[in-house]
């Protein structure tokens, strides 16, 4: 590098004013918040789990039945990557009919916290998605009543709107399933 290319060039009045104006503008304090979700399909329905609440997504595993537990939503317990998780039928908890298709695309979405994990089988997980909070809409009243309490809003996706899962409400319902 030559000495001439290292010396700063003098700024003309117009460039100086443009840079001064750019630095004088206040920094945007409230940027558009992106909501990151894990998109999943159960039957023909698309659902979105808040990515921050998803511990992991793995290939589907066969759970081990829990003796003396008869609630149809409790599928059993499974060892998922070295951690025991209660496997719960998402559709049964939410009040709609669905049977896992299985196959190569089937996945387990694991929610909760370490030591208190809950796994849900889904037909597929195409990936994660970042959505502007402004693009999310409230769940319409037409969302069927049995599982309306588990949907906190709708997330626009290329597959159509996906129901954003209220993880706290879902896990509270799952705890009730285990107790019965």
Question: Residues of each region from the PLM?
Answer:
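An acidic, low-aromatic, low-complexity terminal/linker signal
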Residues: 1-180
């Amino acid at each position: 590098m030559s000495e001439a290319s290292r010396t700063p060039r003098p700024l003309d009045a117009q460039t100086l004013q443009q840079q001064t104006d750019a630095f004088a503008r206040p920094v945007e304090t409230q940027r558009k918040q992106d909501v990151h979700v894990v998109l999943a399909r159960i039957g023909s329905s698309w659902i979105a789990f808040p990515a921050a609440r998803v511990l992991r997504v793995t290939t589907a595993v066969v759970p081990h039945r829990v003796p003396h537990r008869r609630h149809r939503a409790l599928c059993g317990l499974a060892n998922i990557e070295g951690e025991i998780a209660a496997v719960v039928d998402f559709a049964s908890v939410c009040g709609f009919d669905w049977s896992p298709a299985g196959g190569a695309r089937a996945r387990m979405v694991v929610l909760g916290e370490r030591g208190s994990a809950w796994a849900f089988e889904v037909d597929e997980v195409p990936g994660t998605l970042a959505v502007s909070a402004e693009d999310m809409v409230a769940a319409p009243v037409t969302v069927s009543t049995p599982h309306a309490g588990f949907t906190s809003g709708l997330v626009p996706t290329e597959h159509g709107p996906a129901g954003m899962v209220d993880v706290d409400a879902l896990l509270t319902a799952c705890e009730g399933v285990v107790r019965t």
